[in-house]
């Protein structure tokens, strides 16, 4: 699996983090002050890149978290059938099938180039709505 490590205090809104081994985009991060008996804590709220689920975690600011390496690639659509698209990677010419989200199913047509993201062994078509 491809990831890096970073401390919680280094994170910013808009960056990515692994929560429960799922790549998520940080939408909110708050740091508390150190208390009498403990160090400062960071509360991170993030939304899953591939499943759009909201997740939140609390860690000490010196805690090391995993940062996913997200590869952004392009592929050509070979065919569309039953809410699935067969794609061919533009660089490696590898063919694979990905499910289509209902919002973008009518926009994806055979022959067009589409961007897709790959992280932690999962791929998703990332068309702009």
From Swiss-Prot:
GO cellular component, one term: cytoplasm
SUPFAM superfamilies referenced in this protein's UniProt entry, alphabetically: Nucleic acid-binding proteins (SSF50249), Translation proteins SH3-like domain (SSF50104)
Disulfide bond residue pairs: none
Role of this protein: Functions by promoting the formation of the first peptide bond.
One Pfam match: IF5A-like_N
Modified residues (Hypusine): 36
CDD domains: S1_aIF5A
Location of the protein in the cell: Cytoplasm
The encoding gene: eif5a
One record GO biological process: positive regulation of translational elongation
GO molecular function: ribosome binding; RNA binding; translation elongation factor activity; translation initiation factor activity
PROSITE patterns: IF5A_HYPUSINE (PS00302)
Domain of life of the source: Archaea
Protein name per UniProt: Translation initiation factor 5A
Family label: Belongs to the eIF-5A family.
Keywords from the named record: Cytoplasm, Hypusine, Initiation factor, Protein biosynthesis
InterPro entries, alphabetized: IF5A-like, IF5A-like_N, NA-bd_OB-fold, Rib_uL2_dom2, Trans_elong_IF5A_hypusine_site, Transl_elong_IF5A_arc, Transl_elong_IF5A_C, Translation_prot_SH3-like_sf
């Amino acid at each position: 699996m491809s990831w890096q490590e970073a401390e919680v205090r280094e994170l910013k809104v808009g960056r990515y983090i692994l929560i429960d081994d799922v790549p998520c985009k940080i939408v909110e991060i708050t740091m508390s002050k150190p208390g009498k008996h403990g160090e400062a804590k960071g509360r991170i709220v993030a939304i899953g890149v591939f499943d759009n689920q909201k997740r939140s975690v609390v860690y000490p600011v010196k805690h090391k978290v995993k940062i996913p390496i997200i590869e952004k690639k392009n592929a050509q659509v070979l065919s569309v059938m039953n809410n699935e698209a067969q794609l061919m990677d533009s660089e490696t010419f590898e063919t694979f099938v990905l499910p289509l989200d209902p919002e973008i199913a009518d926009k994806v047509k055979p022959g067009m180039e589409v961007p897709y993201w790959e992280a932690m062994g999962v791929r998703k078509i990332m068309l702009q709505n």
